[in-house]
Regions:
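N-terminal cap/leader regions of alpha/beta-hydrolase-fold enzymes
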Residues: 1-255
């Protein structure tokens, strides 16, 4: 598991940061309904973000994260990747996600991101001027791949993504798709994450360099996998810098 079931983003609510947040059911291009959670910024900065969860799907962690983005002026929507196998019903933190992970496919994932981006670009979603994706672990891999999706993104962000080699879902490796990328990349890792060695990070950087893609790679030497968690008090400074890096990449200052 990427996070414990009680994990939450390491970002306290902003006092007085009123936002409009809601549960949604969106439809992919093939008609598949999937759950989502959206939050609109009261004071928009022109940025919008599609949030791609880790293997847990649309966990409360990501609902909280949409609100933290909105408080920072970023219209946000988090999607659940399991609409095709688990339906669009709202689920709790104890959801048994494992049977659904292997049923993911790249085309379906891309279609769902496209539907979420279309919602954000609508009047209901806030119609931001520039769009990003951000993902965590498995969602990080999917987020990086959106740089080749043709969605007209301003950038993609991956936190502790596996960027090279095969994946049990069959999703392609971002490094292998780098020559198709069409926007900047921000990739962030824990240096103490044994699951993503330096060789994997370096290979992705090399692929991006070879493709001429603007990119920023941030490695926090002592941070583990899934360090961006309120419970990880030892990594509070790292989490604070991560948030600053994310907002800077989106062209806005820290809230």
């Amino acid at each position: 598991m990427c996070f414990p079931t009680d994990a939450r983003p390491p970002l306290p609510p902003i006092q007085g940061g009123a936002i409009d947040a809601r549960d949604l059911t969106l439809a992919s291009v093939d008609g598949t309904a999937f759950a989502a959670y959206a939050a609109r910024a009261e004071q928009p900065t022109g940025a919008g973000v599609v949030i791609l969860p880790d293997v847990r799907g649309l966990h409360p962690y990501y609902e909280d994260l949409t609100m933290r983005f909105a408080e920072a002026g970023v219209d946000a929507v988090a999607l659940d990747p399991y609409g095709r196998s688990a339906g669009a019903e709202k689920r709790d933190a104890e959801f048994e996600y494992e049977p659904h992970v292997l049923q993911l496919d790249g085309d379906g994932a891309n279609d769902d991101v496209g539907a979420a981006a279309a919602y954000l670009r609508s009047a209901d979603g806030g119609a931001p001027e520039r769009m990003y994706t951000i993902g965590f672990c498995l969602g990080g891999r999917i987020s990086l791949l959106q740089a080749a999706s043709g969605l007209g993104l301003a950038g993609v962000i991956g936190l502790y993504p596996w960027p090279v080699g095969p994946h049990r879902t069959g999703l392609p490796a971002p490094a292998d798709e780098a020559r198709r990328f069409a926007c900047p990349v921000l990739a962030m890792y824990g240096g103490a994450d044994a699951g993503i060695p330096a060789e994997a990070r370096d290979a992705f950087d090399k692929a991006l360099d070879g493709a001429g893609i603007e990119h920023r790679t941030v490695v926090y030497p002592d941070a583990p996998h899934s360090y961006f968690d309120r419970k990880a008090a030892d990594h509070a400074d790292v989490s604070a810098d991560t948030w600053r890096q994310i907002l800077d990449f989106m062209g806005i200052g820290s809230a």
